[in-house]
Amino acid sequence: MKNFFSMHAILLACSAGAGLAAITQGISEGTYSRIVEMATISQAAYANLCNIPPAITSAGKIYNAETDINGWVLRDDSRQEIITVFRGTGSDTNLQLDTNYTQAPFDTLPQCSGCAVHGGYYVGWVSVKDQVEGLIHQQASQYPDYSLVVTGHSLGASMAAITAAQLSATYNNITVYTFGEPRTGNQAYASYVDETFQATNPDATKFYRVTHTNDGIPNLPPTSQGYVHHGTEYWSVEPHGPQNMYLCLGDEVQCCEAQGGQGVNDAHVTYFGMASGACTW
């Protein structure tokens, strides 16, 4: 299969807006493998963690019946990591959260001055906040040398982003991997994430916002409603591999977002050849 776009076409596509986004082609094998591993866990969350790596065990379930937010706190003793993963949209209740674009003040994180986040996802976060913080505190107390990882796809990606921002007030060893993440907050929130996780510095970042070809969900909610993406975008094109990952840094309209995808499409439900909940990998 040919590459999804030539580099020339990518640069043209990314030149919309005030200026040209900075594009870097290729990432290391190690970073790519790590991203794919987190994508596996995020996609498996749609089917009760089917086919996750055998070294990873569940330390507790996250669930709220009113919002239908689902997730797990996991532990990988081989890597000394405590992993929190959120499932993406899996019900009409979740869809109601998805479409609540009214921004909500990020009141649970007063350190984030002026920050507002997606109203539906904030409702989701508040509904499970105590569970998440309790489970992570339990694991972090028992395994104080372990680092924290937060991940998720789609709705789960925004939940992961909000969770990581919240946890940053307590922990300083957090790495985040999101897949098909919608825009999650306003400029103040995006700036907070960028600063906290060094998200605009590919050499030091602790936040990997991964997109895929023309996935339509990263185009939502629209910027006209005050939403802004945070950090460097890690754009995956096909055929999948470390050399077909592009780091897109700069303008809001960049790589995936510039391809015209709208809403849930094939590129959204499949990342690195793994369909959400299909468990065929």
From Swiss-Prot:
Q: Which UniProt keywords apply?
A: Carbohydrate metabolism, Disulfide bond, Glycoprotein, Hydrolase, Polysaccharide degradation, Secreted, Serine esterase, Signal, Xylan degradation
Annotated EC: 3.1.1.73
Listed GO MF terms: feruloyl esterase activity
Which residues does the Swiss-Prot or TrEMBL record annotate as the active site?
A: S154 (nucleophile), D215 (charge relay system), H268 (charge relay system)
Which residues are the signal sequence here?
Answer: 1-21
Location(s), subcellular: Secreted
Reactions catalysed, as given in the entry: feruloyl-polysaccharide + H2O = ferulate + polysaccharide
* Residues noted as binding substrate in the record, renumbered to the chain: D98, Y101, H268
Concerning Gene3D superfamilies, the annotation shows: alpha/beta hydrolase
Q: Which cysteines are joined by disulfide bonds?
A: C50-C279, C112-C115, C248-C255
Coiled coil ranges (UniProt) are: none
Which cellular component terms (GO) are annotated to the entry?
extracellular region
Q: Does the keyword Hydrolase apply?
A: yes
Pfam families of this UniProt entry? Lipase_3 (PF01764)
A GO BP term here is: lipid metabolic process
Q: Which family does it belong to?
A: Belongs to the AB hydrolase superfamily. FaeA family.
Q: What does this protein do?
A: Involved in degradation of plant cell walls. Hydrolyzes the feruloyl-arabinose ester bond in arabinoxylans, and the feruloyl-galactose ester bond in pectin.
State the PANTHER family in the record: FUNGAL LIPASE-LIKE DOMAIN-CONTAINING PROTEIN-RELATED (PTHR46640:SF1), TRIACYLGLYCEROL LIPASE, PUTATIVE (AFU_ORTHOLOGUE AFUA_6G06510)-RELATED (PTHR46640)
This chain belongs to the protein called Probable feruloyl esterase A
Organism, as annotated: Aspergillus oryzae (strain ATCC 42149 / RIB 40)
